[in-house]
């Protein structure tokens, strides 16, 4: 305790009652939230491995591509031990582009909307491209954190309305709350979304959910086996089923799942195959699987890129074309890159592959 080996110092332990009940009968889920000494055996890694703060023109906003990402909250209802934002959740100080050291700040509506308005006006007056950055119109925003779904409905509504008013065409909400606390997607929240859509029907709304393993949403019997209905289809646990149906039943909302491939959690082709098939069956898309990032203590969680690619490739055998949409992505300083193949042979024309 109170040393570099303190796992609580690296990332506080936190979970919901709903998730605790699932974890009691699932080793993979236990690995998601249970702290172990392995996390601090090797503290190699970076607090900001993608140098994201180099792309932060306004506090709380990352503007690296045509899409912007906003930190709207610094907490979640439970904590994944492998969290890519552990520096934000733990409120740690990181080095910024100007050499200063400070905690990441949260986005604020006046500053964010002023930046978007100014950027898009400059782009519009210069033939559709910003003269300094080369970026096009900022048309899509991802609400992130932390988990935006821990915010009150009124705060989420305020962000949605402010972004719509400033001309954002598509809004994503990144959340793991459907796994941690699916009861959050109640009728009051869904009614708020309905009102938003009635007011701004032209604005797209996408929920980027974070299921890592099918145990997070599928129902199990007392022996730990998945439960099938009379047609042989795997049944969801009631709370997750209700939450997912609440979103996908609204045709104007898209739901897409993305997940890293993490050691002892989902580096299992059978588990990923079940998850991809079950999600697509209920109307959610399989978006990305990610290779682990070099966060602090990453060696306790990451698998080699070759392993991640092999697991995903094997998992998609037997899936239909629409079930197997997910790609493997690796994130580095310049951006996301798809891992399309792995080879031990030299690649013609690629220097250094010999």
Residue ranges and their predicted role:
Residues 83-98:
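Iron-sulfur (Fe-S) cluster-binding segments and ferredoxin-like electron-carrier domains
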Residues 15, 55-86:
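N-terminal pre-triad scaffold of radical SAM enzymes
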Residues 50, 59, 76-86, 115-122, ...:
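A short mid-domain helix/strand-loop element embedded in enzyme catalytic domains
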Residues 94-113:
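Short cysteine/histidine-rich metal-coordination sites, predominantly Zn2+-binding motifs
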Residues 109-138, 146-307, 311-318:
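Conserved AdoMet/S-adenosylmethionine-binding subsite of the radical SAM
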Residues 71, 142, 172:
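Conserved beta-strand segments that form the floor/walls of ligand-binding pockets within enzyme
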Residues 1-64:
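Flexible, acidic/Gly-rich N-terminal and inter-domain linker regions that tether
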Residues 1-24, 273-354:
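Auxiliary Fe-S-binding modules of radical SAM enzymes
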């Amino acid at each position: 305790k109170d040393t570099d080996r303190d796992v609580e110092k690296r990332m506080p332990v936190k979970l919901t009652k709903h998730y605790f009940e699932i974890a009691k009968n699932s080793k993979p889920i236990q690995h998601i939230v249970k702290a172990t000494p392995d996390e601090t055996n090797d503290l190699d890694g970076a607090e900001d491995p993608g140098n994201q703060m180099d792309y932060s023109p306004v506090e709380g906003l990352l503007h690296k591509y045509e899409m912007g990402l906003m930190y709207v909250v610094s907490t979640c209802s439970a904590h994944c031990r492998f969290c890519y934002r552990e520096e934000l959740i733990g409120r740690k100080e990181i080095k910024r582009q100007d050499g200063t050291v400070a905690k990441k700040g949260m986005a604020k509506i006046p500053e964010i909307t002023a930046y978007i308005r100014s950027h898009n006006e400059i782009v519009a007056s210069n033939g559709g491209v910003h003269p300094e950055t080369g970026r096009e119109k900022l048309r899509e925003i991802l609400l992130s954190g932390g988990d935006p779904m821990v915010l009150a409905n009124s705060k989420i509504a305020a962000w949605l309305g402010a972004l719509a008013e400033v001309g954002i065409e598509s809004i994503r909400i990144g959340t793991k709350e459907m796994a941690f606390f699916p009861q959050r997607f109640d009728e009051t929240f869904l009614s708020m979304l309905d009102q938003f859509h009635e007011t701004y029907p032209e604005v797209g709304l996408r929920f980027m959910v974070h299921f890592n393993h099918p145990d997070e949403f599928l129902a199990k019997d007392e022996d730990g086996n998945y439960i099938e209905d009379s047609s042989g289809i795997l049944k969801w646990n009631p709370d997750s089923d209700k939450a997912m149906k609440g979103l996908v039943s609204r045709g104007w909302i898209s739901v897409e799942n993305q997940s890293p491939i993490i050691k002892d959690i989902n580096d299992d082709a059978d588990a990923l195959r079940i998850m991809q098939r079950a999600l697509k069956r209920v109307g959610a898309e399989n978006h990305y699987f990610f290779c682990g990032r070099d966060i602090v203590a990453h060696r306790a969680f990451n698998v080699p890129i070759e392993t991640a690619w092999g697991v995903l490739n094997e998992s998609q055998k037997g899936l239909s074309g629409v079930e197997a949409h997910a790609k493997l992505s690796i994130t580095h300083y310049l951006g996301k890159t798809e891992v399309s193949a792995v080879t031990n042979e030299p690649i013609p024309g690629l220097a250094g592959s010999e």
